[in-house]
Amino acid sequence: MAKTKTGIFSGSFNPIHIGHLALANYLCEFEGLDEVWFMVTPHNPFKNQADLWPDELRLQLVQLAIEGYPRFRVSDFEFHLPRPSYTIHTLNRLKQEYPEREFQLIIGSDNWMVFDRWFESERIVSENKILVYPRPGFSVDKSQLPPNVHVADSPIFEISSTFIREALATGKDIRYFLHPAVYKRIIQQTDSIDSSHSCHT
């Protein structure tokens, strides 16, 4: 029986936006993946991540964003691994726990350019399939790729979570950059924080 081809889309999703969703949608419909798992990365105590939203909020926003599309799944798998967690450890644990699945690591071309700096990068490439999606300003020479690495011909989405956070912080109405349920939840969260702050001032 063929294994379920499962893309691991790991990120902070701080917050998740339509660029993330459209990319994952493309990879399922045009690149042969059966499912995409949004692997929300936890706060790393060894890094300065002052602008990182709480783990549970980011997880909840992804869940809201993917509801109704059966080929997407949100995962808190890395929340339960020792920190700092490394990609090689995550992939090995996933393969142990889900032997019926063929996991493929989804990364941007910007990350591929510095992939040799990743922990155990050679093992990751030799033992796993990697699906690289294009990022603006980071073109990949396909003729130089290892056999396990494939570059997707997906559209380039020039939206960043940093842009989303900065726009929200300045009161911009950017509802069409986010899934409606995500936008609604963020506005509720912001109103709650503002109300709490005003009660204490």
UniProtKB/Swiss-Prot annotation:
It is an enzyme of class 2 (transferase). One of its GO terms (biological process) is NAD biosynthetic process. Pathway: Cofactor biosynthesis; NAD(+) biosynthesis; deamido-NAD(+) from nicotinate D-ribonucleotide: step 1/1. The keyword Transmembrane helix does not apply. The keyword ATP-binding applies. GO terms for molecular function: ATP binding; nicotinate-nucleotide adenylyltransferase activity. Its EC number is 2.7.7.18. It catalyses: nicotinate beta-D-ribonucleotide + ATP + H(+) = deamido-NAD(+) + diphosphate. Keywords: ATP-binding, NAD, Nucleotide-binding, Nucleotidyltransferase, Pyridine nucleotide biosynthesis, Transferase. Catalyzes the reversible adenylation of nicotinate mononucleotide (NaMN) to nicotinic acid adenine dinucleotide (NaAD). Belongs to the NadD family. This is Probable nicotinate-nucleotide adenylyltransferase. The gene is nadD.
